[in-house]
Swiss-Prot record:
InterPro entries: IF-2B-related, IF-M1Pi, IF_2B-like_C, Initiation_fac_2B_a/b/d, M1Pi_N, NagB/RpiA_transferase-like
Alphabetical list of PANTHER family matching this protein: METHYLTHIORIBOSE-1-PHOSPHATE ISOMERASE
The protein, known as: Putative methylthioribose-1-phosphate isomerase
Organism (species): Pyrococcus abyssi (strain GE5 / Orsay)
Entry keyword set: Amino-acid biosynthesis, Isomerase, Methionine biosynthesis
Similarity field: Belongs to the eIF-2B alpha/beta/delta subunits family. MtnA subfamily.
Keyword Amino-acid biosynthesis set for record: yes
Record-marked site positions (Transition state stabilizer): 167
Active site positions, chain numbering: 247 (proton donor)
EC number(s) on file: 5.3.1.23
Gene giving rise to this polypeptide: aIF-2BI
GO molecular function: S-methyl-5-thioribose-1-phosphate isomerase activity
Length: 356
């Protein structure tokens, strides 16, 4: 596979998460599409709250945000000794770790920095601080590079024509470009993407608010549908492939993604439509054997009872899982930053990590 485009050739959007001068900068995704605003965060607690309340969202984006939270701690800590600094480091680590339970990138990024620090405990404190900041930036930069590779891998295997996607796995969900976002942007640049169908993605409307905004901003041909119209457009022969992101892929190929993904996978099988997941290696959790082991976040009932801040239902009990799990039997292929993985996933994912 040859990488033919640079990030700036594929999107006009800035990075969704950045760190400079002891400040984490993030696009506030809660305000879109009404307002585009980059907000500054200068404490670990404020970064953690931004992850929790979905100011920043998307597995790779929250992984980078958490890493930058540790960088922020390192550069603002007033600890006078290494022991005092490490006590504060572990507190910051736990604060960031306890924000959202499903996306594995969060834990992967935090544990990567924690492991590095613990390997260098004999180093001078200033060097440990620099290690943390540099590693956090490396995590963010690697995400952009991974997305670029996934974009080109995906463009090689997806059919020309109309794609359907769910939620937002675009630039906003990552540091830059996106997972699904990179694939559809490369295909758009190549001229092979004719139309991108966007599910609205209730209850938080990431498809309607975020995907519709960012893809139309970059000039892609998009069409928004209600979630319950997906089966009909498939039945009408208007979808050539389905492409979704993944917050956590496990060893057998099952994966967790935004609630409603499983439904699309079953519908794709019924209509003979290829169904692909796109995610970097950092989203693959080989420690879990099946999707039944993935913790599923349940969010506030208010997300279902309201829409755009307006009450749309009476005060009734609500079940609001943020994710569902798609069994691997429905998955045509998994597009990673190393290559496309095909069934049997249990064997081929193990082989993928054996190549590391």
């Amino acid at each position: 596979m040859e990488v033919r485009y640079k990030p700036e050739e594929l999107t006009k959007l800035p990075r969704s998460v950045e760190y400079k001068e002891r400040t984490v900068y993030m696009i506030n995704q809660r305000l879109l599409p009404r307002e585009f605003k980059v907000e500054a965060f200068r404490t670990v607690e404020s970064v953690a709250e931004a992850i929790k309340n979905m100011t920043v969202r998307g597995a790779p984006a929250i992984g980078a945000a958490a890493a930058f939270g540790l960088a922020l701690y390192a550069e603002t800590s007033k600890a006078k000794s290494k022991d005092e600094f490490m006590d504060g480091f572990y507190k910051a680590y736990e604060t960031l770790k306890n924000t959202r339970p499903t996306a594995v990138n969060l834990f992967w990024a935090l544990n990567r920095i924690k492991k590095l620090v613990e390997e260098h405990l004999e180093d001078p404190l200033d060097e440990i601080k620099s290690l943390i900041v540099n590693e956090a930036q490396k995590i963010a930069d690697e995400d952009v590079e991974a997305n670029l590779r996934m974009g080109h891998y995906g463009a090689e295997v997806l059919p020309e024509g109309n794609l359907l996607t769910h939620c937002n796995a675009g630039s906003l969900a990552t540091v830059h470009l996106g997972t699904v976002g990179a694939v559809v942007r490369v295909m758009h640049k190549d001229g092979s993407l004719k139309l991108l169908w966007l599910d609205e993605t209730r209850p938080v409307l990431q498809g309607a608010r975020l995907s519709a905004w960012e893809y139309s901003y970059d000039g892609l041909n998009v069409k928004l549908i209600a979630d319950n119209a997906a089966a009909f457009v498939m039945q009408q022969g208007l979808v050539d492939a389905i492409i979704v992101g993944a917050d956590r892929i496990v060893a057998n190929g099952d994966f967790a993604n935004k609630i409603g993904t499983y439904m699309l996978a079953v519908l794709a099988r019924e209509h003979g439509i290829p169904f692909f997941a796109v995610a970097p290696l950092s989203s693959i959790d080989m420690s879990l054997k099946s999707g039944k082991e993935i913790p599923i976040e349940e969010r506030s009932p208010e997300e279902v009872l309201t829409c755009g801040g307006c009450r749309i239902a009476p005060d009734v009990p609500v079940y609001n899982p943020a994710f569902d799990v798609t069994p691997h039997k429905y998955v045509t292929g998994i597009i990673t930053d190393k290559r496309v993985v095909w069934p049997p996933f249990k064997r081929n994912l193990k082989k993928l990590f054996g190549e590391q």
